[in-house]
């Protein structure tokens, strides 16, 4: 027979599951921050791209461990999430250099490591803010190791991957309209996994293989 529960019991069950999920997420975040701090040596210069709560946690954890380092943060247009992350990091006394996105190629040579987040990860690519592939290519050319930080629940078989190149609000880039003007405002793109030196997860630092 089908077991029935009262509305109150259902609410309590849902609340417990939510708390359990939140606790697991918090523990995963702490582990990722600790593992990620291992890839940053004292006096290193870290470049980031876009914004990631995990990358932010790693940098704050590294700062609290006593290591001295600086972070190069591209502004990440059009929503400027990089700028906002840099300001949050400064509040935690993490030294940051904020640059325009177009200056990434000029500053990548100064970095010892490139650290990014991920929105989704498939069997062969990592989905993140558009521009991630470009900065990864620059890092590879400069022999700068590239790491991505994400929880393992970000893995998603490619066949279930949402449309990556969906157009977003063109007014975020240009509010002027013209029949001859097409505004391309795409948020996400895929970067091959073999571009990366390693992945920082709650289970440790793993290689692309």
List each language-model region with its residue ranges:
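N-terminal active-site beta-alpha-beta segment that forms phosphate/nucleotide-binding
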Residues: 1-99
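Conserved phosphate- and dinucleotide-binding cores of soluble alpha/beta proteins
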Residues: 63-67, 74-209
């Amino acid at each position: 027979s089908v077991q029935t529960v009262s509305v109150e019991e259902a609410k309590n069950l849902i609340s417990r599951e939510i708390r359990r999920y939140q606790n697991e997420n918090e523990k995963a975040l702490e582990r990722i921050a600790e593992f990620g701090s291992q890839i940053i040596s004292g006096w290193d210069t870290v470049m980031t791209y876009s914004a990631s709560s995990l990358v932010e946690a790693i940098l704050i954890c590294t700062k609290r461990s006593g290591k001295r380092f600086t972070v190069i943060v591209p502004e990440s247009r059009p929503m400027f999430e990089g700028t906002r992350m840099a300001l949050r990091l400064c509040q935690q006394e993490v030294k940051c250099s904020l640059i325009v996105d177009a200056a990434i190629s000029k500053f990548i040579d100064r970095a010892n490591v490139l650290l990014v987040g991920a929105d989704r990860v498939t069997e062969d690519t990592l989905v993140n803010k558009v521009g991630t592939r470009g900065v990864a290519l620059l890092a590879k050319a400069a022999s700068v190791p590239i790491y991505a930080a994400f929880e393992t629940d970000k893995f998603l078989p490619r066949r279930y991957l949402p449309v990556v190149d969906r157009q977003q609000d063109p007014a975020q880039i240009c509010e002027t309209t013209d029949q001859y003007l097409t505004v391309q405002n795409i948020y996400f793109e895929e970067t091959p996994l073999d571009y990366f030196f390693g992945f920082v997860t709650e289970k440790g630092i793993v290689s692309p293989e």
